């Protein structure tokens, strides 16, 4: 949900782990200090391994498009990322990537440039973009560099516009709730 002048509105069904890292940290804190909420935690979920699960999600997306080519750099992008509600999570993901040996940055999508077949921020090439934009199809002119790099397959974007169109576009909920179409 996003808040605008008309109040909260559904804009997507998440295709990424948005909010998951913050929730994992909160769950670990609750588990460590609060026996009274222990009943709320599934025994088969290892909070200690959740970061590995999150990282595996990004690596699987990378490998699906790049095979065994090594992933070196990740850009976590949004418009004005420091102003976003989940900005602390962006930083947590950046730290996770760096702990695993990847160069990682949190950057405003408008600061990206596409030059000579490579998406870059300043002088640094970007291999994978963790896309937190709500411009799901990258149609806004300010995201032109990312759109061109993505359509040329010069960067891996996750989640990518096609994933949103297939799995997360809220307009699909109409179809999913139409008994006649589902019959």
Predicted regions, residues:
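Conserved acidic functional residues
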Residues: 1-2, 12
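Short hydrophobic beta-strand that contains or immediately precedes a catalytic carboxylate
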Residues: 10-17
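Domain-scale recognition of functional cores that engage charged ligands
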Residues: 2-5, 19-24, 28-183
